[in-house]
């Protein structure tokens, strides 16, 4: 399956990197690359591996060794990455 990152998910990664970079630029790059690597490595061949999402019609990939969760939606042969959230964040009712 193809991975398609939404503009919102890309913005989430950009903001996350900037936030972490205030304290540790090297760690910021590493965290963002870790998230991207896990999504791109795991979901194309195992799109159902994420848990059922809090928002109907979505699934969630928990990124190992981080507090981040990536909600996504399956549409035909595409895994649409919707957002990148901190697990402690209050989630919206729709994505």
Residue map of PLM features:
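Basic, Lys/Arg-enriched alpha-helical interface segments
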Residues: 2-59, 94
